[in-house]
Amino acid sequence: MKERLLFLICFLCISFMLKAADKPVIKISTENVDLIYRVGDNGRLYQSYLGKRLNHATDIAHLPQGSEAYLTHGMEDYFEPAIHIVHNDGNPSTLLKYVSHTRNQVSPGVDEVVITMQDDKYPVTVKLHYVAYQKENLIKTFTEISHREKKPVQLHKYASSMLHLNRANYFLTEFSGDWASEAHVKEQPLEFGKKTIDTKLGARANMFCSPFFQLALDGKSEENQGEVLVGTLGWTGNFSFVFEVDNKNELRVISGINPYASEYSLKPNEIFRTPDFYFTYSFTGKGQASRNFHDWARKYQVKDGNQTRMTLLNNWEATYFDFDEAKLVKLMDDAVELGVDMFLLDDGWFANKYPRSGDHQGLCDWDETTDKLPHGVGYLTEAAKKKGIKFGIWIEPEMVNPKSELYEKHKDWVIHLPNRDEYYFRNQLVLDLSNPKVQDYVFGVVDNLMTKYPDIAFFKW
């Protein structure tokens, strides 16, 4: 009897192991971190693990199934989805199942895994991309969405990333502020419910809150100890980070374009690609997480990131709008004495009918103010060259003051709402860059400066 029972137990264990072996386990690794997905018996993809690298197959085999990797709208889960598609027949639900995955080396030390999922009732394909930077312990993720339905489908939400964590406590750090009062640090515990860091300001997305976050696990963040996940989105428009703690104290982090006013009509066979989400995971505090990002940015993101950076002297704080050629040349002398590489001429050098003596007029009239610069910008570029430093200049050709020659001639070039009064921020309006005439004008401003003054080495824009 005992032998039969032992045989039955062994048989069941072997059957379970063989069954588990049939289901793909997808491991995305850096030197210190593992992000592991597995396919469930129902064919759906689950995030099984995110944490310190696991080097033994037995450790991976004993991991739980986990949470659905890229949660869809309209099915049985009650929590915030990563994707919301309305099909061309009006069905607002999507159910994604695993199809395949690929793995390739992008470059030495950089690997990419692509997981393909499809809805088995609708011809919709979602690809999850993961690019792992080994030494920097940083992972880049983005999503591609396509379909072969007869008509366009509507994308209401399309996250770049969805991560799952299961810890005792979570402490979120965000960075908020305003002009001249940037990056106020606030750390707070996350408890049941949702916390969102987002913006709806479009091109001024970074105005009041920064598009990155810091998440400490189990305890508050410390500089040199503790587990910390830091994330950011490679996107200059509306962004959203949603942190949702559920009834089991499990945390979902959904990152991507803010769904607000961002519905997208996706045509058949068109591929929609989300922005990149970047995250790093440190086991020795937030200081190491910061260094991971710095190392990655210098090597992979910033041009000549590991080279010596140039320094510049900007006249703005020294003169504001009150300057002439003599003042600027004197500042160049000071720059040379300090060993600075470049002099930058900021706001206030342009406009004649309405000279740029303050921020209330002249913007978008890009001719040198003759009272301030009787010899033009060329005099300054030549002076800088003689002193052995480079010359840069400030422009903002997409903005306009109502008190300007350009506005008087082309009021129809500004963005405005019909039947509404104009609203001024810093006494200025935005030109409509969807207008081909405006595009030509803005291009002409930059082209004219570069052609007329080829020694301009830098634009502050």
Question: What function would you assign to each model-found segment?
Answer:
Residues 22-36, 44-244, 260:
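Polysaccharide-binding surfaces and accessory modules of carbohydrate-active proteins
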Residues 1-23:
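Bacterial Sec-dependent N-terminal signal peptides
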Residues 304-454, 458:
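Aromatic-lined carbohydrate-binding/catalytic grooves of carbohydrate-active enzymes
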Residues 21-25, 249-267:
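Short acidic, Pro/Gly- and aromatic-enriched capping/linker segments at domain boundaries
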Residues 279-310, 317:
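Terminal connector regions
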Residues 133, 266, 371-374:
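Hydrophobic beta-strand core residues of beta-sandwich domains
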Residues 91-98, 264-283:
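Short Pro-Gly-centered flexible turn/kink motifs
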Residues 40, 148, 158-160, 348-350, ...:
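An acidic- and aromatic-residue-enriched active-site/binding cleft used to recognize and process polar
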